[in-house]
Every structure is written in C-alpha cells, then in structure tokens.
Amino acid sequence: MTRFRIALHIVPRRGILDPQGKAVSDALHSLGFPGVQDVRVGRFLTIDTTAENAEAARQSARVMCEKLLANPVTEDFEIASVEVS
C-alpha cells in the first residue's frame, strides 16, 4: 500500500444561498475592490490515506465526499490533487 495525500475543495452549489460568501463580497467592495463579482466560501480538506494506487485513492476520496464530507443537495466537491506523501 502507498500513502497518499488528497486535497479536496467543497463549495456551495451555484444557485444556493451563500450568506458567508455574500458577507465577504460586501466587505471586499467596502474595502475598495469593486471588481469582485461573486464569492463562494467553502472548505478545503487534506486527507492522508493509503491505497493500492492513485486511482484507488481518488475513488476512495470520491466515495468519502459522496457519503459524508459533502452534502449532495447543496454542495459540489472537487478532488484537487492526489499525491504520494
């Protein structure tokens, strides 16, 4: 088994109210950043795990997100990277 570090991004789906993102967007505008169009506030996770290969680690991360880490109704997730650690 090989040890992998997986990086995940979980964010609210488009069209889902993101009050935290709205607050950050408003604050950025008040600080002089008028070009900010949209802010989505989510979570960044790193998971250290073991697997036979990178594809098995990626598949495991996908199942983790589908079963626990991301709410499939309100959130989208992205497996940003799977690297040998």
Residue ranges and their predicted role:
Residues 1-85:
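Long, contiguous binding/interaction regions
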